[in-house]
């Protein structure tokens, strides 16, 4: 994951902190402030910031729409509080941020763990969801190889990607909490149970499922998710892994914006 878009995307953004369930949640709003269309909410990956997950995509995504990007609990500019990281809580925090901003309905683009949060939002608060983009995410533990899950039992902060460490240390209000953030992120994945096929079938929002052909998420699993979702489209990106999917491929944000802009059948 690279940071090349981080400076450019902040030039004309509205920035602030929102009081959300005991957090002071950092957010930015990009794009035309008076745009009456449905805003897009970006849900970043684990151990990341919205810049590391979406920095290279955000300028294109923000053309013609408002884009809300934020750092969730204990990530980036949002300080941690004394509670674990859970997908349910992250979903509640995202919806509370929208309520704080006076937004009743939005599109959601979740990458990796952000995709898991998007799934939880669609299940817990379907009324706030117009469309979903779920990128490099899984709905149960069959979505990745056993070795992936086993790796969390002996994860060390030394194994954390350097770009993610540097991004955290650059902006975190309490940089010394990096080891705690890493430990909480590992625990969240150790506790991951996912959702049943019946729950995935109950998501009726139009959904674009995106995965790389060399992703941590098995492409076959993405196909299964696509088949379960009642109103889904599927994109399997060639020669793409879990990290390179965040690189500035011009056709990725174009594919996403085309999906969001096309009227749902």
Where are these regions (language model features)?
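Catalytic histidine neighborhood in serine/cysteine hydrolases
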Residues: 222, 228-243
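Active-site loop/oxyanion-hole signature of alpha/beta-hydrolase fold enzymes
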Residues: 55, 62, 69-109
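Conserved alpha/beta-hydrolase "acid-adjacent" motif
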Residues: 216-221
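Conserved HGGG/HGGXW glycine-rich cap/lid loop of the alpha/beta-hydrolase fold
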Residues: 23-77
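Flexible "cap/lid" loop of the alpha/beta hydrolase fold
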Residues: 116-124, 130-164
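Catalytic active-site module of serine/aspartate enzymes centered on a nucleophile-bearing elbow/loop
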Residues: 238-265
């Amino acid at each position: 994951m690279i940071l090349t878009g981080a400076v450019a995307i902040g030039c004309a953004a509205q920035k602030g902190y929102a009081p959300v369930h005991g957090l002071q949640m950092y957010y930015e709003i990009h794009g035309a402030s008076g745009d009456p269309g449905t805003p897009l909410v970006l849900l970043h990956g684990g151990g990341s910031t919205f810049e590391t997950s979406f920095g290279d995509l955000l300028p294109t995504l923000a053309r013609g729409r408002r884009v809300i990007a934020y750092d969730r609990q204990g990530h980036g500019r949002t300080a941690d509080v004394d509670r674990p990281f859970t997908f349910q809580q992250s979903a509640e925090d995202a919806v509370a941020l929208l309520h704080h901003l006076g937004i009743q309905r939005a599109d959601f683009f979740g990458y990796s763990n952000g995709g898991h949060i998007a799934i939880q939002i669609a299940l817990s608060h379907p009324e706030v969801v117009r469309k979903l983009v779920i990128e490099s995410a899984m709905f149960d533990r069959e979505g990745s190889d056993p070795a992936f899950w086993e790796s969390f039992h002996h994860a060390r902060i030394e194994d954390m990607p350097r770009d993610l460490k540097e991004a955290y240390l650059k902006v975190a209000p309490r940089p010394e909490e990096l080891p705690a953030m890493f430990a909480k992120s590992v625990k969240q994945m150790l506790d991951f149970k996912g959702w049943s096929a019946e729950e995935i079938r109950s998501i009726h929002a139009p959904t674009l499922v995106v995965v790389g052909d060399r992703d941590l998420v098995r492409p076959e699993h993405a196909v299964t998710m696509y088949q379960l979702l009642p109103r889904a489209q599927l994109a399997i990106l060639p020669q793409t892994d879990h990290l390179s999917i965040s690189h500035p491929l011009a056709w990725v944000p174009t594919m996403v914006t085309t999906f969001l802009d096309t009227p749902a059948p």
